[in-house]
């Protein structure tokens, strides 16, 4: 069994929605990114890649490569799952914590879990997503961006 940790941050920019866990959420800002900016799926991808000793998403999907401009992070996550499986691993479970002052995540978490489970090809009870604030402290508390911490457990396939 292997455990991986993922962490990602994206800064807010002009826009009127963000995408987290594959869910489009109305917001007063967007997220600045080369891809679609789905910080949750990026952190999960990094956790999976880390657990399999396969580097990180920057190695597999460099932000200097034009083919990944505006990329759908769900497609990137599915690709990560494919290469992790090719190395002989399957997902045991994943857990993620979204750190954001706004927008409120609670109304969207179940849909995020369902989409992530679909992309990972696992059962819903193998995926956990939760959210917290920093009580208005730090960059997330000042609503400058969003951060996500995640862990993944891989089991031999």
UniProtKB/Swiss-Prot annotation:
Keywords from the named record: Isoprene biosynthesis, Lyase, Metal-binding
Alphabetical GO biological process terms: isopentenyl diphosphate biosynthetic process, methylerythritol 4-phosphate pathway; terpenoid biosynthetic process
First-tier enzyme category under EC: lyase
GO MF: 2-C-methyl-D-erythritol 2,4-cyclodiphosphate synthase activity; metal ion binding
Sites where the protein binds 4-CDP-2-C-methyl-D-erythritol 2-phosphate: 8-10, 34-35, 56-58, 61-65, 100-106, 132-135, 139, 142
Cofactor: a divalent metal cation
Catalytic activity reported: 4-CDP-2-C-methyl-D-erythritol 2-phosphate = 2-C-methyl-D-erythritol 2,4-cyclic diphosphate + CMP
Pathway(s) served: Isoprenoid biosynthesis; isopentenyl diphosphate biosynthesis via DXP pathway; isopentenyl diphosphate from 1-deoxy-D-xylulose 5-phosphate: step 4/6
Keyword Metal-binding listed: yes
Membrane-crossing residue ranges in chain numbering: none
CC cofactor note: Binds 1 divalent metal cation per subunit.
Protein EC: 4.6.1.12
Protein's UniProt keywords contain Lyase: yes
InterPro entries, per database record: MECDP_synthase, MECDP_synthase_CS, MECDP_synthase_sf
Function (record text): Involved in the biosynthesis of isopentenyl diphosphate (IPP) and dimethylallyl diphosphate (DMAPP), two major building blocks of isoprenoid compounds. Catalyzes the conversion of 4-diphosphocytidyl-2-C-methyl-D-erythritol 2-phosphate (CDP-ME2P) to 2-C-methyl-D-erythritol 2,4-cyclodiphosphate (ME-CPP) with a corresponding release of cytidine 5-monophosphate (CMP).
Assembly and interaction partners: Homotrimer.
Family the UniProt entry places it in: Belongs to the IspF family.
Identification of the protein by name: 2-C-methyl-D-erythritol 2,4-cyclodiphosphate synthase
Source organism per UniProt: Pseudomonas putida (strain GB-1)
């Amino acid at each position: 069994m292997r455990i991986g940790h993922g962490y990602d941050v994206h800064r807010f920019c002009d826009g009127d929605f963000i995408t987290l866990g594959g869910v489009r959420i109305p917001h007063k800002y967007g997220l600045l990114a080369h891809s679609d900016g789905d910080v949750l799926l990026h952190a999960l991808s990094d956790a999976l890649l880390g657990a399999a000793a396969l580097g990180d998403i920057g190695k597999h999907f460099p932000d200097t490569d034009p083919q990944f401009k505006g990329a759908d992070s769900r497609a990137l996550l599915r690709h990560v799952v494919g290469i992790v499986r090719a190395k002989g691993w399957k997902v045991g479970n994943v857990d993620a914590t979204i750190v954001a002052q706004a927008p409120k995540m609670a109304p969207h978490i179940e849909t995020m879990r369902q989409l992530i489970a679909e992309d990972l090809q696992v059962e819903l009870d193998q995926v956990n997503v939760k959210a917290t604030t920093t009580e208005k402290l730090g960059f997330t508390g000042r609503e400058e961006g969003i951060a996500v911490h995640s862990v993944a457990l891989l089991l031999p396939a």
